[in-house]
Amino acid sequence: MESRIAIVGANGVGKSTLLKLLVGKLELTSGNSYRNGRLSLSMFTQHHIDQLKLPLSPLEQFMTDFPGATQETYRSHLGSFGITGNLALRPNYLLSGGQKSRVAFSLAMWKNPHILVLDEPTNHLDIDAVNALIVALNNYNGGVIIVSHDQHLVSTVCEEIWYIKDTRLKKFAGDFEDYRRMLSMGKL
């Protein structure tokens, strides 16, 4: 379960919809899907900041969303995402966009899911936050499925490229550079 997969394709072909189907945020309108009942998935989206409870601090949000651990455990987890010291006590609405993204990513990672599903995760991130995300994903022991137009993220994190065209998901035999080259030549 340590696969690193990028799903690419033109805007509007259904990449985000596919991810929502995978994590159960949407239901199929036809056909069947099967998933191991013990499989845990977590999703981090381009709208990740929307999941934050803005009046709460990151520490308070963890205590509310995932009760039962010690403050030290929450703070240690937040610290591994760069939310340290007084930052963990500051209301979410006072955090920068990059800091909010780190809090949201730490929330997605709390239960150590088997597979992390990311939908345009670098939107709204500064370069430092993008690099921190890349390091975190490369150190992550589970599987990763990413929808992104960010060539640096995909090239640095993903080992497989899958593309959607004409409502079909197909594995691409090559890396992201090869995919872009084939696309520019009109061969996909």
Region spans (language model):
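ABC ATP-binding cassette signature C-motif
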Residues: 1-188
